[in-house]
C-alpha cells in the first residue's frame, strides 16, 4: 500500500514562492533603494520661477486665487530673486503690470517700465540669475488682447502683422535692459522670426528666445489673468491660441518656431498636454519647457487648504510627471516651495 504524504504548510509556501520569478518590489523595499533606482529627479535648477512686477506706485499684494504668489515692485522682485537663487533656482520669468494701458500696449517698451526696471535691478544684485521676460501685449492693452485690434467684416480681431512690429519693440526693450531671454507668448504667426531678426540687427544676438510654441486656448489660465490683470474685455483668444484638441498642429507650430530661430520651445499648459510634451521631446533636439500654469497651481492649493490632498506630495508628483513626460525646464509657481522642500 502506497502512502501519500500531504505537503506541509511550509512546502506549499515554497511552491508558491518558486512560481514568482520576478520580484520588482525588491527595488522598492527601502527609501535608499528607491532613490538609487529613481528614473526621474526634479531639481530646483530645472525650474523657472514666474514673477509679477508692478510699478513702484503700487504695493506688494498677494493674489487671492493663487495663495503664495504676489504682485511685487522691482525692489521686492530683486529680494525674491536673491532668495530663489540661494534656494537653487537659476531662472526667473518676469510679467509686467504697467502704470497705464492703451490700445497698442505702448507702455511695454518704456525703458523705465516695471519689467525693464526689474531686469536691471536683478542683473545688478543677482548677476548670475538668468532673467527671462514674457513678450506679449495683453497685460499692457486696454482691451486685454495680445495684439492690435482691427475690425474685419463687422468683427473685432487681432491683426497679426501689425502686432509683430510691436512685439519686436517690446522684446528689444527687454533685451536692452539686460534680459537673457525673451519669451513671446502671443501666438502670432512669424513672431519668433521677427524678434530674432530684430535682436540680431541691433547686435543683441546673445539674447535667446524661449518661444511659447504650443500655447493652447485653455481654461486653466483664469488665475493668471487676475494676477496679470490681463483678461480680454471682449471675446476670447481662440483665433490665435491653439485648439486643445489638436496635437499634430502643436508639432507643426513647434517646428515653425524651431525653423524661425527659437532656442527653447515650450508647451503650455503642462498637465493636460503631457502627450504633446512627450511628442515634442521625441521629435525635436532643442530644450523643451513646459508651463505648469496658474489653474493647475490653484487647484492644488485649494484642495490642500480643504484638507483633501497632501499639497506637498501632489506638487512633487505633478512636477515629476511633467519632467518624466520629457520637459527639460518647468515654469511653475511652486518653484520656491519646491526648492525649500528639496533642500530640506
Predicted segments with their positions:
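Alpha/beta enzyme core
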Residues: 18, 30, 43-48, 54-344
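N-terminal amphipathic/basic leader segments beginning at the initiator methionine
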Residues: 2-38
Amino acid at each position: 500500500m502506497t502512502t501519500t504524504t500531504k505537503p506541509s504548510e511550509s512546502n506549499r509556501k515554497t511552491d508558491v514562492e518558486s512560481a514568482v520569478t520576478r520580484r520588482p518590489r525588491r527595488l522598492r523595499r527601502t527609501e535608499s533603494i528607491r532613490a538609487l533606482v529613481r528614473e526621474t529627479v526634479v531639481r530646483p535648477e530645472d525650474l523657472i520661477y514666474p514673477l509679477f512686477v508692478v510699478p513702484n506706485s503700487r504695493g506688494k499684494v498677494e493674489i487671492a486665487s493663487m495663495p503664495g504668489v504676489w504682485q511685487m515692485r522691482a525692489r521686492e522682485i530683486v529680494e525674491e530673486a536673491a532668495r530663489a537663487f540661494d534656494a537653487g533656482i537659476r531662472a526667473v520669468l518676469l510679467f509686467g503690470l504697467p502704470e497705464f494701458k492703451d490700445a497698442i500696449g505702448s507702455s511695454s517698451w518704456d525703458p523705465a517700465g516695471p519689467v525693464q526696471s526689474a531686469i536691471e535691478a536683478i542683473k545688478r544684485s543677482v548677476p548670475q540669475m538668468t532673467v527671462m521676460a514674457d513678450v506679449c501685449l495683453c497685460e499692457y492693452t486696454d482691451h486685454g488682447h495680445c495684439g492690435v485690434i482691427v475690425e474685419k467684416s463687422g468683427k473685432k480681431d487681432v491683426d497679426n502683422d501689425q502686432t509683430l512690429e510691436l512685439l519686436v519693440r517690446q522684446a528689444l526693450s527687454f533685451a536692452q535692459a539686460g534680459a537673457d531671454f525673451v519669451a513671446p507668448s502671443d501666438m502670432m504667426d512669424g513672431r519668433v522670426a521677427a524678434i530674432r531678426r530684430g535682436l540680431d540687427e541691433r547686435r543683441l544676438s546673445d539674447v535667446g528666445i524661449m518661444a511659447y510654441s504650443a500655447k493652447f486656448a485653455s481654461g486653466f489660465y483664469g488665475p493668471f489673468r487676475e494676477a496679470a490683470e490681463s483678461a480680454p474685455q471682449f471675446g476670447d483668444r481662440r483665433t490665435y491660441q491653439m485648439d486643445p484638441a489638436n496635437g499634430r498642429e502643436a508639432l507643426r507650430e513647434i517646428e515653425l518656431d524651431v525653423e524661425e530661430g527659437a532656442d527653447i520651445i515650450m508647451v503650455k499648459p503642462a498637465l493636460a498636454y503631457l502627450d504633446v510634451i512627450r511628442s515634442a521631446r521625441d521629435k525635436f533636439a532643442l530644450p523643451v519647457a513646459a508651463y505648469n500654469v496658474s489653474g493647475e497651481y490653484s487647484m492644488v492649493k485649494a484642495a490642500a487648504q480643504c484638507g483633501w490632498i497632501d499639497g506637498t506630495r501632489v506638487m512633487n508628483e505633478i512636477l515629476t510627471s511633467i519632467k518624466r513626460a520629457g520637459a527639460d525646464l518647468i515654469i511653475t509657481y511652486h518653484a520656491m516651495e519646491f526648492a525649500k522642500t528639496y533642500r530640506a
